[in-house]
């Protein structure tokens, strides 16, 4: 069975986070964006959930690139979540760490993130 819906989490490669910290930030993004989809694009959320919740993690160069991707995604009607760290461990409070996009139709999500490299 092919996937028709997916979620992409974009992590900043310039922060050099530990693996554990990165995993937590990606998880925050995935859950927060899924909740946004549940509230605003329920049919996309439900289809994605039924299909097994496909997720892909890719990297962006910096915060500026995350904002650009967020703008592109929102223009296409995709749910997004920009995650700011609480700053309790490795990085200063308020540091933007990841952008989660979707879940949404795979072909729409790919218009925004298809050119990015896997993490």
UniProtKB/Swiss-Prot annotation:
It is found in: Cytoplasm. InterPro entries: Pep_tRNA_hydro_II_dom_sf, Pept_tRNA_hydro_arch, PTH2. Its EC number is 3.1.1.29. One of its GO terms (cellular component) is cytosol. Keywords: Cytoplasm, Hydrolase. It comes from the Archaea. Its main location: cytoplasm. It is an enzyme of class 3 (hydrolase). SUPFAM superfamilies: Peptidyl-tRNA hydrolase II. One of its GO terms (biological process) is translation. CDD domains: PTH2 (cd02430). It catalyses: an N-acyl-L-alpha-aminoacyl-tRNA + H2O = an N-acyl-L-amino acid + a tRNA + H(+). GO terms for molecular function: peptidyl-tRNA hydrolase activity. PANTHER family: PEPTIDYL-TRNA HYDROLASE 2, PEPTIDYL-TRNA HYDROLASE 2, MITOCHONDRIAL. Belongs to the PTH2 family. NCBIfam families: arch_pth2, PRK04322.1. The natural substrate for this enzyme may be peptidyl-tRNAs which drop off the ribosome during protein synthesis. This is Peptidyl-tRNA hydrolase. It comes from Pyrococcus furiosus (strain ATCC 43587 / DSM 3638 / JCM 8422 / Vc1). The gene is pth.
